[in-house]
Amino acid sequence: MPMISVRRARAADRPMVERLWLMFRHDMSEFDGGLPNPDGTFRAEWLAAAFEDRNWAGYVFTGPEDRPMGFAIVRSLDGPARVLNSFFVVRSMRRAGVGLQAVSVIVAEHPGPWEVAFQDANAVAVRFWRRVATEFAGSDWSEERRGIPGKPDLPPDVWISFTAARRHDTRPG
């Protein structure tokens, strides 16, 4: 399992996260049918919020030589439940434990209720987020389908809710 560093994104990280964002949105387009803007970019208001809104936080995961392995965006830091809004691991690091290590560090920083959304069609995400919920809450987590606001033609998102009531051991078990 690779050694990773997980930390809050700083202003200097923004160009790197913007590049990773393009990869993330490209991956997600398989499930949401989204096309890039005419200039080749994708919607990025969530990315902007991670750097500009105090109720949001961006995280970066890096490996040896500070090479990027992924990022996460959390919203509702002051709300009743934190929402893991966006989560991305570069393809070469998927299924290597990077995602579980990263989410463990992030969730441990914000104990309490959490929610994460993903698409039923994304079988890898389905397995991963159910495993994450079980790691943190045992069998005490819930799953529901919620329509996507403004997109009635898309299948509903799957939302998992769990509570991280204590500092979680960041070593995957």
What is the role of each PLM region?
Residues 100, 120-144, 150-151:
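Conserved active-site alpha-helix within GNAT-family acetyltransferase domains
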